[in-house]
Amino acid sequence: MMKNVFLLISVVTVMTASAQTKPVQKKPATVSKPTVQKVVAPVASERLVEITTDYGTMIAKLYNQTPLHRDNFIKLVQSGFYDSLLFHRVIKEFMIQGGDPGSKNAPDSIMLGAGSAPGDRIPAEFRPNFFHKKGALAAARDGNPAKASSNCQFYIVEGKKIDTAQLNNIYNQGVKQNNPSFKYSKAQKEIYERIGGTAFLDQNYTVFGEVISGIDVIDKIASVQTKPGDRPEKNVMMKMRMLN
């Protein structure tokens, strides 16, 4: 239905939250009786999705303020759509992209990125408070003028650190044209400088969630060896499930 969804990556090739770790708990010197702790799902106002790969597991939250993308993603996860699909396009210091249904059992020689799920594109849901910081979960798209999203392909940002001067240049050269009323907040500037991202995509592609655990997995996948076309030499398969 949609052609060349991976336009996102072809454009950026020219241009080119935080991991949660459990504190180490000291064991008591003596234990009289083992106790069994009940496992409780994380409490969150947003829906949480677990993304499992050979390089580790990520947990992402889906923003309630982007309900069209949130609900579509949940539907696909719950149906098993993403299971056994690949992160088929990987660019270090940029992003890892997946969700093309054609990537399941795809031969190594196949160019991926043009596939879609049944149904229409998802209308754009740009929000000023959602931006392409490291760990951002966003929707890929083709070059349609409405900037509507692919109904299945997504990417997770690795990016790189951006200082204030660089961010101002990016804003003036592109982001401002995407949305003249948008301005970076002080907090957003600090985040780009501290953890990085891909600011040149802001207000141009819909960000609908973010990785809140397993951010190191993004770095591991983004660092794999790739072939021409940015497909990993060794397939990076995914499996997803909703946590709440």
Please describe what each predicted stretch is:
Residues 1-23:
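Bacterial Sec-dependent N-terminal signal peptides
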